[in-house]
Regions:
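C-terminal peripheral helix-coil segments that are non-catalytic and often amphipathic
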Residues: 116, 144-200
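Hydrophobic alpha-helical connector segments
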Residues: 61-105, 128-131
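Helix-turn-helix
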Residues: 5, 9-47, 51
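Short, basic, alpha-helical segments at the C-terminal edge of helix-turn-helix-like DNA-binding modules
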Residues: 54-59
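Amphipathic alpha-helical interaction segments
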Residues: 5, 47, 76, 105, ...
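DNA major-groove recognition helix of helix-turn-helix
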Residues: 42, 52-53, 128, 135
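Short acidic alpha-helix initiation/capping motifs at coil-to-helix transition points
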Residues: 26-29, 101-107
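Hydrophobic alpha-helical bundle segments that form small-molecule/ligand-binding pockets
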Residues: 106-154, 182-186
Length: 200
């Protein structure tokens, strides 16, 4: 028995239901071992939560300096994070994943990209918070669309009737809009802000 085996078994159960539905007892049953065997490797359910999120996010690469503008590097990072989370929709990243080791690695990578792009510390923090909020919303929308059998299509019912949107196209357009908004309202030395001053 290894921690890696436990994590992979947990992900299998999560993909069949959700992280909230997986207990240490159900995990032990899946592995056909006593519950205490699991606790010898993983101290708690909270620790298991972080381990499975780490496993899911490990594949996401932070584009190094020299691989394009800050905008393109951030697009690559956001695409990678989205793809990783879509593979395991039951993880509920917004509730369980933001403090995991790999999530922190990606957060530090995003901040590094923003600093390389010329943002001052305070502006970089604001830009990161904006991008992070966007990603959490996108993940939830992806999960909702997939759970409704959308197959990559998001359907909204409203006063104007049904509106069908391709999830990948929506993601790209929305990400471009967020990045453009960051440049407009925060700006960098190479691209001074043209929007309103923060707080006014």
């Amino acid at each position: 028995m290894t921690t890696e085996q436990i994590v992979k078994a947990a992900l299998k159960l999560i993909d069949e239901s959700s992280l909230d539905d997986v207990s240490m007892r159900s995990l032990a049953s899946e592995l056909r071992v006593p519950v205490m065997t699991i606790y010898n490797y993983v101290a708690s359910k909270e620790a298991l939560n972080e381990l499975v999120v780490d496993h899911a996010l490990r594949q996401v690469e932070v584009p190094p300096p020299g691989e394009g503008s800050w905008e393109e590097r951030m697009r690559q990072l956001q695409r990678g994070a989205r793809e990783a989370m879509r593979q395991h929709p039951g993880l509920s990243f917004s509730r369980h994943g933001s403090s995991s080791r790999e999530a922190m690695r990606l957060a530090e990578g995003a901040m590094s990209i923003l600093h390389d792009g010329g943002f001052a510390p305070g502006e970089a923090e604001m830009a990161f918070a904006t991008l992070f909020t966007f990603m959490l919303g996108q993940i939830e929308l992806d999960v909702l669309s997939d759970s409704m059998g959308g197959g990559g299509e998001a359907t909204f019912e409203g006063a104007t009737g049904a509106l069908d949107l391709n999830q990948d196209e929506l993601f790209e357009v929305s990400l471009d809009a967020v990045i453009a908004g960051i440049n407009l309202n925060l700006g960098t030395p190479a691209n001074p802000r043209r929007g309103r001053t923060r707080g006014k």
